[in-house]
Regions:
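Conserved non-cysteine loop/helix-boundary elements of the Radical SAM core domain that shape
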Residues: 1-103
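Anionic group-transfer/hydrolysis microenvironments
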Residues: 3, 42, 118, 156-158
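Conserved catalytic loop of SAM-dependent methyltransferase domains
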Residues: 119-129, 136
């Protein structure tokens, strides 16, 4: 997932992928026959403005994903922007209605329709996250995850498995710190 198509921003926020890698892997997935590809974008990333959002949307439109999820920046506990917040204190973070409207306009132009919306804590601009999809390409998994109705099994160090118990309206989360030797 690209988050943005501005390389300077990816570098700033500590992402280890490049814009070129995103494009290359997207095309590779298409060449391998993947027919339902989503791209996650984040609006409100440090030092990005409306022109950067427009540039990202132009590049995403060229790739023609089957769905796009537009997230408003929410700084997570373990995010680089939170861990090193003193270093980033003077960075400009914008998330405006104009940016949100621009992403919706591009989604419509790409033939994508909104199919789910959710809010989370600590979101820049107090906006929401919106999933857009082409007809017949909506991902029910995304809806179930947001409603915490879907079990997620994670493998690897630092991952979190969530087990749902719908009949009991209960959720169990477990983070894997160390993988035991088998």
């Amino acid at each position: 997932n690209p988050q943005t198509m501005k390389q300077a921003t990816l570098d700033l926020i500590g992402r280890h992928h490049t814009v070129d890698m995103v494009k290359e892997k997207f095309r590779m997935a298409r060449d391998l026959g993947f027919d339902n590809i989503n791209m996650d974008l984040i609006i409100g990333l440090p030092e990005e403005d409306i022109d950067d959002v427009r540039s990202t949307m132009e590049q995403v439109r060229e790739l023609a994903p089957d769905s796009v999820t537009v997230h408003s920046l929410a700084i997570k506990r373990a995010a680089r922007l939170n861990i090193f917040k003193e270093r980033y204190a003077n960075l400009k973070i914008q998330n405006t209605q104009e940016m949100i409207d621009l992403t919706a306009k591009y989604a419509r132009e790409m033939g994508l329709e909104p199919y789910y919306l959710y809010r989370q804590k600590n979101m820049a601009g107090n906006f929401e996250n919106v999933g857009y999809a082409a007809p017949g390409k909506a991902c029910i998994y995304n809806i179930l995850i947001m409603e915490e109705k879907q079990t997620i099994v994670a493998c690897g160090a630092g991952t979190t498995t969530k087990v749902t118990f719908p009949a009991e309206n209960r959720l169990l989360s477990k983070t894997v710190d160390i993988i035991p030797k088998i």
